[in-house]
Protein backbone atom coordinates (compact mmCIF):
# COMPACT_ATOMS: atom_id res chain seq x y z
CA UNK A 1 0.00 0.00 0.00
CA UNK A 2 1.29 3.44 -0.93
CA UNK A 3 0.78 6.37 1.42
CA UNK A 4 0.91 9.89 0.05
CA UNK A 5 1.42 12.95 2.21
CA UNK A 6 0.54 16.12 0.36
CA UNK A 7 1.47 19.49 1.85
CA UNK A 8 -0.65 21.80 -0.27
CA UNK A 9 -0.84 24.68 2.18
CA UNK A 10 1.40 27.70 2.51
CA UNK A 11 2.39 26.43 5.95
CA UNK A 12 4.17 23.42 4.44
CA UNK A 13 4.45 20.02 6.09
CA UNK A 14 5.60 19.34 9.62
CA UNK A 15 6.67 15.86 10.69
CA UNK A 16 7.32 15.37 14.39
CA UNK A 17 9.89 12.82 15.51
CA UNK A 18 9.42 10.37 18.35
CA UNK A 19 10.88 10.96 21.82
CA UNK A 20 14.37 9.97 20.69
CA UNK A 21 14.63 13.25 18.84
CA UNK A 22 15.68 11.53 15.62
CA UNK A 23 13.55 11.48 12.49
CA UNK A 24 14.09 8.69 9.98
CA UNK A 25 12.65 8.37 6.49
CA UNK A 26 12.53 4.74 5.43
CA UNK A 27 11.84 2.78 2.26
CA UNK A 28 11.29 -0.99 2.29
CA UNK A 29 12.42 -1.05 5.91
CA UNK A 30 15.73 0.66 5.16
CA UNK A 31 16.58 4.10 6.50
CA UNK A 32 17.19 6.47 3.58
CA UNK A 33 17.41 9.75 5.48
CA UNK A 34 18.13 10.58 9.11
CA UNK A 35 17.51 14.01 10.57
CA UNK A 36 19.06 14.62 13.98
CA UNK A 37 17.41 16.29 16.96
CA UNK A 38 19.01 19.57 15.92
CA UNK A 39 17.13 19.49 12.63
CA UNK A 40 20.20 18.62 10.60
CA UNK A 41 21.17 15.74 8.36
CA UNK A 42 23.27 12.95 9.77
CA UNK A 43 26.94 12.98 8.83
CA UNK A 44 27.67 11.35 5.49
CA UNK A 45 24.43 12.23 3.76
CA UNK A 46 24.55 13.79 0.31
CA UNK A 47 23.34 17.38 0.36
CA UNK A 48 23.58 18.08 -3.38
CA UNK A 49 25.33 16.75 -6.47
CA UNK A 50 25.55 19.04 -9.49
CA UNK A 51 27.14 17.42 -12.52
CA UNK A 52 27.71 17.63 -16.26
CA UNK A 53 27.35 14.75 -18.70
CA UNK A 54 29.10 16.04 -21.80
CA UNK A 55 28.72 14.32 -25.16
CA UNK A 56 29.46 15.40 -28.70
CA UNK A 57 30.15 13.91 -32.11
CA UNK A 58 32.80 16.62 -32.49
CA UNK A 59 36.23 15.63 -31.24
CA UNK A 60 37.79 17.56 -28.36
CA UNK A 61 41.60 17.65 -28.32
CA UNK A 62 44.21 18.55 -25.73
CA UNK A 63 48.00 18.75 -26.03
CA UNK A 64 50.93 20.31 -24.21
CA UNK A 65 50.80 22.27 -20.96
CA UNK A 66 47.97 21.74 -18.49
CA UNK A 67 44.96 23.88 -19.40
CA UNK A 68 41.17 23.78 -19.23
CA UNK A 69 39.84 20.87 -21.22
CA UNK A 70 36.53 22.55 -22.10
CA UNK A 71 34.33 25.29 -20.62
CA UNK A 72 31.42 22.88 -21.24
CA UNK A 73 32.73 20.82 -18.32
CA UNK A 74 32.32 23.54 -15.68
CA UNK A 75 30.25 22.64 -12.63
CA UNK A 76 29.04 25.29 -10.17
CA UNK A 77 28.15 24.65 -6.56
CA UNK A 78 27.21 26.74 -3.53
CA UNK A 79 27.95 24.59 -0.47
CA UNK A 80 25.19 24.54 2.13
CA UNK A 81 27.66 24.07 4.98
CA UNK A 82 31.25 25.28 5.30
CA UNK A 83 32.18 22.03 7.06
CA UNK A 84 30.86 19.82 4.26
CA UNK A 85 33.17 17.59 2.26
CA UNK A 86 33.22 18.29 -1.47
CA UNK A 87 33.91 15.14 -3.48
CA UNK A 88 34.95 15.85 -7.08
CA UNK A 89 34.76 13.00 -9.63
CA UNK A 90 35.78 12.82 -13.29
CA UNK A 91 35.29 9.90 -15.64
CA UNK A 92 36.33 10.16 -19.28
CA UNK A 93 37.47 8.09 -22.22
CA UNK A 94 40.48 9.32 -24.17
CA UNK A 95 42.51 8.25 -27.16
CA UNK A 96 46.19 9.08 -27.61
CA UNK A 97 46.93 7.51 -31.00
CA UNK A 98 50.41 6.16 -31.74
CA UNK A 99 52.12 8.13 -29.00
CA UNK A 100 54.38 7.45 -26.04
CA UNK A 101 53.62 10.29 -23.67
CA UNK A 102 52.74 11.18 -20.11
CA UNK A 103 49.34 12.74 -19.51
CA UNK A 104 48.25 14.74 -16.45
CA UNK A 105 44.95 16.09 -15.17
CA UNK A 106 43.61 17.96 -12.17
CA UNK A 107 40.51 19.78 -11.05
CA UNK A 108 40.59 23.57 -11.09
CA UNK A 109 38.63 26.16 -9.10
CA UNK A 110 37.75 28.81 -11.70
CA UNK A 111 36.28 31.17 -9.11
CA UNK A 112 39.32 31.24 -6.85
CA UNK A 113 41.92 30.58 -9.60
CA UNK A 114 43.51 27.67 -7.78
CA UNK A 115 43.86 23.91 -7.90
CA UNK A 116 41.79 22.52 -4.99
CA UNK A 117 42.66 19.65 -2.69
CA UNK A 118 46.18 19.05 -4.02
CA UNK A 119 48.51 16.35 -2.70
CA UNK A 120 51.62 17.65 -0.90
CA UNK A 121 54.57 19.11 -2.79
CA UNK A 122 57.59 16.86 -3.27
CA UNK A 123 60.61 18.23 -5.11
CA UNK A 124 59.88 19.27 -8.68
CA UNK A 125 57.11 16.72 -9.16
CA UNK A 126 53.84 17.90 -10.69
CA UNK A 127 51.02 18.06 -8.16
CA UNK A 128 48.03 16.56 -9.96
CA UNK A 129 44.95 14.42 -9.36
CA UNK A 130 45.68 11.94 -12.20
CA UNK A 131 48.52 10.85 -14.47
CA UNK A 132 49.31 8.05 -16.90
CA UNK A 133 52.05 7.07 -19.33
CA UNK A 134 50.59 5.86 -22.61
CA UNK A 135 52.45 3.49 -24.92
CA UNK A 136 51.82 3.45 -28.65
CA UNK A 137 50.04 0.54 -30.30
CA UNK A 138 47.82 2.01 -32.99
CA UNK A 139 45.31 4.70 -33.89
CA UNK A 140 42.94 3.37 -31.26
CA UNK A 141 45.05 3.71 -28.12
CA UNK A 142 42.09 3.99 -25.74
CA UNK A 143 42.45 4.73 -22.03
CA UNK A 144 40.38 5.79 -19.03
CA UNK A 145 40.83 9.11 -17.28
CA UNK A 146 39.15 8.49 -13.94
CA UNK A 147 40.12 10.53 -10.89
CA UNK A 148 38.72 11.99 -7.70
CA UNK A 149 39.62 14.59 -5.09
CA UNK A 150 38.02 15.55 -1.81
CA UNK A 151 38.32 18.28 0.79
CA UNK A 152 36.42 20.57 3.12
CA UNK A 153 34.30 23.26 1.48
CA UNK A 154 35.70 25.89 3.86
CA UNK A 155 32.88 28.36 3.21
CA UNK A 156 29.42 28.62 1.72
CA UNK A 157 30.65 30.83 -1.11
CA UNK A 158 29.65 29.83 -4.63
CA UNK A 159 32.43 28.41 -6.76
CA UNK A 160 32.87 26.80 -10.17
CA UNK A 161 35.10 23.81 -10.83
CA UNK A 162 36.44 22.50 -14.13
CA UNK A 163 38.92 19.94 -15.48
CA UNK A 164 42.43 20.66 -16.70
CA UNK A 165 44.43 18.23 -18.85
CA UNK A 166 47.91 18.26 -20.37
CA UNK A 167 50.51 16.05 -22.06
CA UNK A 168 54.21 15.96 -22.81
CA UNK A 169 53.29 16.90 -26.35
CA UNK A 170 50.98 14.24 -27.77
CA UNK A 171 47.46 15.19 -28.80
CA UNK A 172 44.77 13.48 -26.75
CA UNK A 173 41.34 12.95 -28.23
CA UNK A 174 38.15 13.14 -26.16
CA UNK A 175 34.46 12.58 -27.00
CA UNK A 176 35.13 11.12 -30.48
CA UNK A 177 38.02 9.17 -31.96
CA UNK A 178 39.58 10.12 -35.29
CA UNK A 179 38.79 6.70 -36.71
CA UNK A 180 35.20 6.69 -37.92
CA UNK A 181 35.05 2.94 -38.53
CA UNK A 182 33.39 0.42 -36.21
CA UNK A 183 36.58 0.36 -34.14
CA UNK A 184 36.27 4.06 -33.39
CA UNK A 185 34.01 5.42 -30.67
CA UNK A 186 32.13 8.37 -29.28
CA UNK A 187 32.07 8.49 -25.48
CA UNK A 188 31.04 10.94 -22.74
CA UNK A 189 32.92 12.93 -20.15
CA UNK A 190 31.19 12.98 -16.76
CA UNK A 191 32.14 15.46 -14.03
CA UNK A 192 30.32 15.77 -10.71
CA UNK A 193 30.75 17.62 -7.43
CA UNK A 194 29.06 16.03 -4.42
CA UNK A 195 28.50 17.89 -1.17
CA UNK A 196 28.59 15.46 1.76
CA UNK A 197 27.31 16.68 5.11
CA UNK A 198 30.09 16.68 7.71
CA UNK A 199 29.03 18.51 10.90
Regions flagged by a language model, labelled:
Residues 1-10, 30-60:
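Glycine-rich, low-complexity segments
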Residues 17, 27, 37:
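Residues on the solvent-exposed faces and adjacent turns
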Residues 29-31, 112-113:
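Short acidic/polar mixed-charge low-complexity motifs
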Residues 53-54, 59-65, 76-158, 162-199:
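Terminal beta-strand-rich extracellular "head" domains
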Residues 69-71:
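Short, solvent-exposed loop/turn segments enriched in Ser/Thr/Gly
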